[in-house]
Amino acid sequence: MDKNTGAEIEEIRPGSQADASGIAPGDVILSINGHKVNDTIDFMFFAGDGFLDMLVRRKDKRLSFRLQTEEGKDTGIALKPFKIKTCTNKCIFCFVGQLPKGLRRTLYIKDEDYRMSFLYGNYVTLTNLSPQDKKRIVEQRLSPIYISVHSTNNAVRKMILGNSK
């Protein structure tokens, strides 16, 4: 696993299982029970098993930790936010492009990220999904995902979205 994989820990709750085990902020979770972890969704999905064998990267070292969690209790681990996948469409109606200048920066983020849809209810057109993303959505039962449908006619859809997909 390279340095660009994993989910970085932002905070450890004092007195938690993670705190007692020696896991620390800045550690990067590489896997849980042999399953690769890339973001918050992977972490939540795989951390529900009760017994967690975690592989963590700390600087240039790989460390193993074993946690036992009770059902309904969290591990005490808070992850840093993942990098949002941005939109590559050139929609003729894009509200982000129509915003006035001078608003807060976060309003100008054109996200097209199914993870944001699942976690926060953002709408997506699904034009940038990879085969791996589709597989993950099914395997992890990521629902609901809010889909922005503007036309079911493929030619019209491509024209409206400004995207050949």
Which ranges hold each PLM region?
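N-terminal alpha-helical targeting/anchoring segments
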Residues: 37-45
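N-terminal functional module detector in eukaryotic proteins
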Residues: 24, 38, 53-54, 90
